[in-house]
């Protein structure tokens, strides 16, 4: 029995109403644990860095040149397998903190988990759209953002940071767009931004917003106001624990499914054209998609 399974069992004992979600998470974990991490080939690639509005390359656009079968295979594997490893590393501590009633660290880690799942869903969405359009133009910018994007980019002009960065490292994907992709992927026609709202709630805990520390204070009514007492240990909120576990289950299902769909894509060159074959799209090459 793994640490995660034991934590889920203990959580279900404390909160019997969560037993169904806890069991569902255990089943997803068992399935993912059996998935292979197959090695893949990563080719040397060239990134074109354009000058920005101020005539420098710091804020310029970055595009991968020569996007072919090897580049796309490598990219989809990086995103899918990197997402899987990141998500799995977060799940045990998330459940552990929920079990201990420590909602703040659980929600902060859950936010990161949701972001990782969202990246896989966003890349799947953009890849599918590109295949249907028969063009990789949009992927030329997306690939470096997902592989070489860094938050340090905004500090590039500082010597101490500039020495750490390579010229091809630039902007990251817009996380709100990625969360929207995750919501659309999971809920399909019923998508109405539920995960976008959940993500905003998680941000309340990750950012120094007052809503995130409410469980650390006790308010007692006094004439004309309240007496506020802060305590170092937060009081457990059963409703928040339930919502956290439910969101984790959705994030796991959606993130791992998106990653596996990315891995299912196949790319090859035929008659000088790129041919991409993936779920729901069939085989596409340089024009409107047709199904083999």
Predicted regions and their residues:
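A cross-kingdom marker of C-terminal helix-rich interaction/assembly modules
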Residues: 1-115, 119-125, 129-292
């Amino acid at each position: 029995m793994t640490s995660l399974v034991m934590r889920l069992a203990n959580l279900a004992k404390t909160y019997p109403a969560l037993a169904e979600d806890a069991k569902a998470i255990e089943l997803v974990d068992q399935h993912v644990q059996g998935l292979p991490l197959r090695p893949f080939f990563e080719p040397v690639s060239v990134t074109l860095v354009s000058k920005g509005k101020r005539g420098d390359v710091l804020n310029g656009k970055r595009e991968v040149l020569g996007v072919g079968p090897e580049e796309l295979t490598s990219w989809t594997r990086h995103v899918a397998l990197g997402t899987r490893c990141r998500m799995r590393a977060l799940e045990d501590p998330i459940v552990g903190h929920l079990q201990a009633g420590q909602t703040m660290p659980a929600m902060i880690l859950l936010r990161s988990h949701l972001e990782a799942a969202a990246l896989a869903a966003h890349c799947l969405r953009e890849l599918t759209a590109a295949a249907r359009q028969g063009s990789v133009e949009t992927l030329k910018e997306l690939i470096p953002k997902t592989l070489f994007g860094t938050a340090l980019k905004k500090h590039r002009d500082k010597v101490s940071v500039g020495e750490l960065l390579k010229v091809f490292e630039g902007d990251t994907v817009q996380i709100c767009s990625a969360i929207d992709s995750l919501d659309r992927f999971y809920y399909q026609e019923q998508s109405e931004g539920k995960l976008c709202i959940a993500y905003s709630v998680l941000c309340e805990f990750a950012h120094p917003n007052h809503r995130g520390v409410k469980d650390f204070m006790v308010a007692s009514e006094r004439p004309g106001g309240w007496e506020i007492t802060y305590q170092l240990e937060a009081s457990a909120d059963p409703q928040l624990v339930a919502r956290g576990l439910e969101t984790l289950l959705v994030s796991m299902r959606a993130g791992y499914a998106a990653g596996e769909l990315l891995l299912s894509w196949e790319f090859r060159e035929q008659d000088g054209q790129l041919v991409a074959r993936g779920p729901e799209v069939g085989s596409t090459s340089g024009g409107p998609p047709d199904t083999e």
